[in-house]
Regions:
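Nucleotide donor/acceptor-binding cores
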Residues: 38-40
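A short acidic, Gly/Pro-enriched loop at the edge of an enzyme's catalytic core
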Residues: 98-106
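Class I SAM-dependent methyltransferase SAM/SAH-binding core
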Residues: 42-44, 48-96
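C-terminal lobe and adjacent flexible extensions of AdoMet/dcAdoMet transferase-like proteins
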Residues: 198-243
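A short SAM/SAH-binding and catalytic strip from SAM-dependent methyltransferases
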Residues: 105-119
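Conserved class I S-adenosyl-L-methionine
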Residues: 1-36, 50, 54
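SAM-dependent methyltransferase
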Residues: 139-200
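A short glycine-rich, Lys/Arg-flanked "PGG" loop and its adjoining helix->strand segment in the class I
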Residues: 122-134
């Protein structure tokens, strides 16, 4: 996995802090994880530690974040120290995690969309499965196979899609995070069948797809029609993998 956020920590955090979809996304992840009280959580591609921190707030026993960007890990540690929470962090590429240990819940928000090939997608799931307890869950948030740039560039939701081009058996997208200067990131979109095959080969027992849980309160908080693009051409989707 080659993407690095070291040079764009400020732009990414500005996007993340202002993103109108963040509350929807964390609500969805929490709901899909099931009962989290007293559970151990591993937050992969953790960034600032937002998701792991939210799971702690909802009763998780522990949360450990892993990210390949040292800049993100430094920021996450400083934020946890400032807030006084007990989330812990390590800087590692998910493909090369040296530590052992199984967790009740493993979170992967916007991780697998960095797989630049189907082989890399399969290897990423294979690298993650040993860290999921038997009976545990991997909760994934990734690029929606059904999203199409022709139907909207997603700029209203905090990140702008500049390109959406065929790539191998999927698509390659160029995303722009706002800032001065803007930051560009490359992501990859794969079909549901590709994910399901990777999940099965890795050794998970079951997988299910879920749409983000947009609630009426979210709709009421914005101007009429604001969420239309999110509902009908959402860039993200969730996948729950059972072990």
């Amino acid at each position: 996995m080659s993407a690095s956020y070291d040079s764009i920590v400020d732009q990414y955090m500005a996007y993340a802090n202002a993103s109108p979809t963040r509350p929807v996304e964390v609500r969805t992840m929490l709901r899909l994880a099931g009962e989290v009280q007293g559970k151990s959580v591993l937050d992969l591609a953790c960034g600032s530690g937002y998701y792991g921190r939210e799971f702690l707030r909802h009763g998780a026993r522990s949360a450990h974040g892993v990210d390949q960007s040292q800049g993100m890990i430094d920021f996450a540690r400083a934020l946890s120290k400032y807030r006084g929470d007990e989330m812990t962090f390590q800087q590692h590429d998910v493909m090369e995690m040296p530590f052992t240990g199984e967790y009740d819940v493993v979170l992967a928000a916007y991780l697998f969309n960095y797989a630049a090939s189907l082989d890399e997608l399969r290897r990423m799931f294979a690298a993650v499965v040993p860290h999921v307890k038997r009976g545990g869950r991997l909760v994934v948030q990734t690029l929606n196979p059904d999203y199409r740039l022709a139907l909207g560039n997603y700029a209203a939701y905090g990140v702008k899609v500049l390109e959406d081009e065929p790539w191998q058996q999927g698509a390659r997208l160029c995303l722009e995070f706002p800032g001065s200067p803007p930051a560009l990131i490359t992501n990859y979109r794969w079909e549901r069948a590709h994910y399901e095959q990777a999940v099965r080969v890795a050794g998970f027992s079951a997988a299910s797809w879920h749409e983000p849980l947009l609630e009426q309160a979210d709709v009421d908080s914005r101007a009429e029609g604001y969420w239309e693009g999110y509902v009908h051409n959402c860039m993200s989707v969730n996948l729950v993998c059972e072990r």
